[in-house]
């Protein structure tokens, strides 16, 4: 069995299965005797197939395939994860907004550099995404997602707010994204803008 890496940041971009959904997936795979959908991997790290890999580890007799993909950096990989997950039919509106926002934030980093880090090493990482390029990125994502450029920008703030809320109160991300609690979009975005001690 391949030893693949699970990156928590990559894994956490993917809406988790419920316990019942995971059990059903495991039963179906065991019934088939194989994992038919390949695990998608970048540099030995799983991008898609975390649940299938967990099942494979529990049942090493299962056959499976690995499909390797190539990206220039981890932000391109995150963008791919978000775009791929947006193709799922069973997303809540909150999960969809979060994924669109995460994709936008990742593509800003992939194409515009690390705008927050003072320790970024390459000059490419230190370049800021120009406003015109940010608008082009938002419009491209909006076209892909069937939404508006302004929605993509708001989704970026929403995603940052959800992640900031999770940092302040672990477990709340799942409650927000499943709709168990329904804060306003403005309230979620405000968390991202607040100083860490005020969250």
Identify the function of each model-found stretch.
Residues 28, 158, 193-194:
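Residues within well-ordered alpha-helical secondary structure of globular protein domains
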